[in-house]
Amino acid sequence: MKRVDYSREAFECPEYDTFESPLLKSQPLVSIIIPTLNRYDYLADVLRDLERQDYKNFEVLVVDQTDPFQESFYQEWSLDLRYWYQEEKALWKARNEAIQAARSEWVLLYDDDSRIDSNWISEHLKTIDFFQADISSGVSLSVVGAEIPKHYSYFRWSDQLDTGNVLFKKSIFDDIGYFDLQFEKQRMGDGEFGMRAYLNGYKNISNPKAKRIHLKVSQGGLRQMGSWDGWRPKKLFGPRPVPSVLYFSRKYFGRRLSIFFLLHSIIPSILPYKYKGNRILTVLVFLTFPLFFPFIVFQVFYSWYLSTAKLKNQHN
């Protein structure tokens, strides 16, 4: 049996490179939405990259949650720029309100700690047009100059939705609702919306042409609000996993599969994230798990209790 490297042979799309996109030629307005929190230095690089885009018909909406808010930062940019201060530190609220305020049918979500090439907007629009898709999910890299991972190196139906690099039709939100605010300050809000879009028949294409460098800086953003890893609580007596993880799982996959999900993931989660993949420490965690068992059980039941409250309060 011959082994085939599907990522390099089976899914080539040479006609994309020569495709003359009618959508791109029509130059529709694109609304780029950026929530920000305590990252003016990085946001400046973001706006400079947008100034250098080869596609020019776009507006930028910045929802600033920084303390102290510096209105002077927004002067002198060569952009169609709108901004406002949001007192509450809330990512999904910021995105929902900015989407509602957007003037365009095309909404492009972006992060405040990322870098992009000059053809970023163009490639998103071209992909939407070429595949007659509803969503273009760009690729995110963590290192400047890094090679795109094989499973993201070709066009395909996307199995993720990254709200730091994705283009939507605004009408999708009118149809299936906005981001679920019960994920605020927690995890998987973008994944839940992606699942909702998929179940409602929207075509989401993984787009290797629209890549970004996600710097994942330590200051500001969601990490400042106390959430980074869905399985490793920040506080000793915090729920494990983050309640929104179980909320998502129970909402879409039910109680039984969520229990299997816990059994599969809970022991590896004891190992700190920076040591993830260390085989020796992983074995040590498995050997010492009985010592942690009562404490872990408390964390899991606490998370389950909180996710139950979320299920009772869900609006979608």
Question: Predicted regions: what is each one?
Answer:
Residues 107:
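Short aromatic/hydrophobic "clamp" motif used to bind/position activated sugar donors
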Residues 1-2, 207-232:
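Active-site donor/metal-binding and catalytic loop motifs
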Residues 103-104, 162-177:
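Conserved nucleotide-sugar donor-binding
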Residues 86-102:
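Glycine-rich, basic loop-to-helix element that forms the pyrophosphate-binding segment
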Residues 48-57:
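Short, acidic, metal-binding catalytic loop of nucleotide-sugar glycosyltransferases
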